[in-house]
Regions:
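Key DNA-contact positions within bacterial/archaeal DNA-binding proteins
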Residues: 49
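A short acidic, leucine-rich amphipathic alpha-helix
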Residues: 39-43
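Glycine-centered, phosphate/nucleic-acid-interacting loop/turn motifs that mediate DNA/RNA or nucleotide
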Residues: 62
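Short capping segments at the starts of secondary-structure elements
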Residues: 21, 32-36
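Short, Lys/Arg-rich nucleic-acid/phosphate-binding segment
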Residues: 20, 68-74
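Short helix-coil-helix linker/hinge
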Residues: 16-23
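Amphipathic alpha-helical dimerization/coiled-coil segments
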Residues: 1-10, 79-102
Length: 102
């Protein structure tokens, strides 16, 4: 069941803070399948340290989870985000519309 506060949290993480666009791009990839940090950095053409920071923010807010240890860690979207994916998708589409404005 979707969390009534989820939309506020998701707006804050993705549309209300610096780095929100990159966090949304990370989630877009993780919705497809799990990735490790190096794969995310390469796919998004971002610095490894930036990915590490964004993943940390997403983990603290229960948006992503991880499996494995040390160099074998892969990240995936959390059950919380899966339950609230419609809210994320709505925010994501609004973000894309904002980016396409002249």
């Amino acid at each position: 069941m979707p969390d009534p506060n989820a939309k506020r949290i998701l707006w804050y993480l993705f549309a209300g803070t610096r780095g929100g666009i990159n966090r949304a791009r990370i989630v877009d990839l993780l919705k497809e399948h799990p990735y490790n940090m190096n794969q995310l950095a390469e796919a998004l053409e971002l610095d490894y340290k930036a990915i590490k920071h964004h993943i940390s923010v997403l983990e603290k807010n229960n948006i992503v989870g991880k499996m494995g240890e040390k160099y074998g860690v892969v990240y995936f979207i959390s059950n919380y985000l899966e339950a609230n994916i419609e809210a994320f998708n709505e925010i994501r589409s609004k973000m894309k519309m904002e980016m396409n404005r002249p």
